[in-house]
A protein has these predicted regions:
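Family-specific functional microsites
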Residues: 63-64, 68-221
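Extended C-terminal regions of large enzymes
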Residues: 1-112, 219-220
Length: 221
């Protein structure tokens, strides 16, 4: 804690400086002293403030020189409807059977839409290298719903998902995207998570030199 205090005094990024930043943003009140009710009092004061801050960050527009919103939460904001835990997190206790859904929801992945950010590429240049002779932006929607390279596997996945929810096939692409990343049952959660994992594994195999025509041998939804 002493070392962290020294880092904070030098304005270095650490846990303590982040706590201090949130303390300032949320205007955390100074309590008279610890008591049985102080925790409840502080929680009652901070919860609505944090929710307001969270909603502001979720919808914040960060317009760049290209007139495009560069908010990293752009995908998450289309999926997150309330300040509460998502149901799918409680439907499947095994973290590995839902982690890929979470990664795609919060943009914690290696799709070019994110890799390009760190390389300083314009969004228009963050294209999908797995599409043949096309210039599609390699974002979450394209990856999950549109990339033609994985059309056969996706159609198989869609068929299995539709057997669980027959209304799925009538949805638009954007609606399907939101539906898949907001699964309602444990079966939907595991199926979608498995497909996303397969897609990432598939892309990795292509990077290693495997032919797309032979990948069906290694992966099945």
């Amino acid at each position: 804690m002493v070392e962290m205090g020294a880092m904070a005094n030098q304005s270095q990024d650490c846990w303590l400086t982040r706590v201090q930043k949130m303390e300032k943003i949320l205007n955390v009140p100074i309590l008279a002293g610890p008591s049985r009710s102080s925790g409840k009092t502080l929680l009652a004061d901070l919860e609505p403030k944090f929710e307001q801050f969270w909603r502001m960050k979720l919808t914040e527009e960060k317009i760049g020189p290209d007139n495009i919103n560069h908010n990293k939460l752009r995908t998450y904001s289309t999926l997150k409807k309330s300040f509460s835990q998502e149901p799918y997190l409680g439907l499947v206790q095994n973290r590995t059977q839902r982690m890929h859904i979470t990664r795609l929801r919060i943009s914690a992945h290696n799709l070019n839409i994110e890799w390009g950010r760190y390389k300083g590429l314009a969004i228009a240049n963050r294209v999908c290298k797995y599409c043949q002779n096309e210039t599609n932006i390699d974002d979450e929607l394209h990856f999950l719903n549109k990339c033609k390279t994985f059309l056969t596997s996706r159609n198989c996945f869609y068929g299995k998902f539709s057997s669980i929810d027959p209304t799925f096939k009538f949805l638009s692409e954007n609606q399907k995207f939101e539906r898949l990343l907001n699964p309602k049952t444990s079966q939907e959660t595991r199926l979608t998570n498995k497909f996303i994992k397969i897609m990432f594994d598939w892309r990795e195999k292509i990077d290693q030199g495997f032919s797309i025509t032979n990948l069906g041998i290694y992966f099945a939804v």
